[in-house]
Amino acid sequence: MRHLRLIATLALAAATGTGGASASADPVWVVSQQGAELARIEAGTVAGRIPLGPAPVAAAADRAGRLYLTHPDGRAVTVVEPGKPPRRLPVPGQAFGLAASPDGAHLFVGDWSGDRVLRISAATGAVEGTAAVGHEPAHLVLDRRGRLYVADRESRQVSVIDTGTMTRVAVVPTGEAPFALALAPDEASLYVANVRSGDLTVIDTATLRARATVPAGRMPYGVAVTGDGSRILVTNQHAAAVTVIDAARLEIVATVAVGPYPEGIAVVGPRAYVANWFSDDVSVIDLATWRETARIKVAEGPRTVLAPGEPAR
């Protein structure tokens, strides 16, 4: 499982956090894989901690504030609901990438070793359908039309799935080892971080074709987009930095130093939050100055950052 541990981060823009906080501020949720913990960050500090099962990886949320987390080694999904203890759903496969329907009825789970995506009931875990994809499906993103985009890491492609019929409707070639995905706010573009080729593939979601490839730093791993869609933020594991790309010109306009081995990233209003795997903390970036303004300690091995914002798709 060492290869999974080294690529186990997703940067997700998701629905509201639990606890009734407004979407204009925190909370920000941080998943620590080695520490098996979900931390809630509010007002620049850790305001709560939820113990999880071993090695949680990916996270998603629905409009009701329920959080979902995958455990590849445990073949399971943990469900965290406001006011209730976490519950566990068994998954018939190596659960890795994850997306949730906005109403929380369905979960879409990438089976890392099975080259497929499962649609399961979020209430019972019952399998409702499957779709074949490429090798080692990583990040999953669901759009407002019900199309699911899947980064097929070892197939150098993104699979596009109709979630109503659970059929693959398109395959889009990318760079080497696509891992993290992010949709533009208007969903006209999908940004794909390619780990081994050091670049970003930009996919036109209307034509389902790649329209550009952009250098994105040393080992780009996580990707997020600012709320106005003007900037794309990409973590660079081997540079301890975040590369900032102008979305209109598709040019690098800034580089922000963060902690060692940055992985997941999420944007919340005027700030971005970056999970630093090697230093067990989260960097806070001011989007006006493009500078790191704080580091927040969390449990060992932070991989995923889940932030409030647009509803989960």
Which residues does each PLM region occupy?
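N-terminal secretory signal peptides that target proteins for export/translocation
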Residues: M1-R2
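Predominantly soluble domains enriched in secretory-pathway, periplasmic, or organellar proteins
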Residues: R5-R313
